[in-house]
């Protein structure tokens, strides 16, 4: 199970991947200074740190509200979601296109073609993913963080 939760008072997003805890921090918070700390409260761009190297960012996850796009940038790869007005969100990973079908209840399913590869639930500043294939765990952990950043952004905008 993957669980991403925003810790607002700490200004971080914790991502639990099995027993490990990954940490997402706003990029502005890393630069110091009061102005940057204030800007970090409204950030839509986060660095993700894994327990193996807690001081070196593993990836950058950002959200663009204007086009409803979650962007994931690792050292090797880059992925971004594509949204449509009435259709599902899509994302390409490993040469495969996945579709994300969301419900108004916060539940969603990630499909490869017509086969479900993961199911999720959005909560208040949180995202939980279950029933996924092990080889997708790292990718889905990044996506879970992106969903929490998306939720936080819409809280600020809406």
Predicted regions located by residue number:
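Intrinsically disordered, low-complexity proline/glycine-rich segments
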Residues: 1-158
């Amino acid at each position: 199970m993957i669980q991403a939760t925003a810790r607002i008072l700490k200004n971080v997003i914790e991502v639990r991947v099995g027993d490990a805890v990954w940490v997402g921090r706003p990029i502005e918070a890393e630069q110091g200074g009061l102005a940057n700390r204030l800007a970090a409260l409204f950030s839509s761009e986060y660095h993700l740190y894994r327990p193996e190297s807690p001081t070196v960012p593993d990836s950058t996850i950002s959200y663009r509200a204007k086009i409803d796009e979650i962007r994931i940038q690792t050292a090797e790869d880059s992925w971004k979601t594509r949204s449509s007005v009435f259709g599902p969100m899509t994302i390409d990973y490993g040469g495969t296109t996945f579709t994300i079908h969301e419900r108004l209840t916060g539940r969603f399913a990630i499909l490869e073609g017509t086969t479900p590869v993961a199911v999720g639930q959005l909560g208040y500043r949180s995202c939980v993913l279950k029933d996924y294939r092990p080889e997708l765990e790292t990718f889905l952990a990044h996506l879970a963080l992106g969903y929490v950043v998306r939720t936080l952004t819409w809280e600020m905008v809406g």
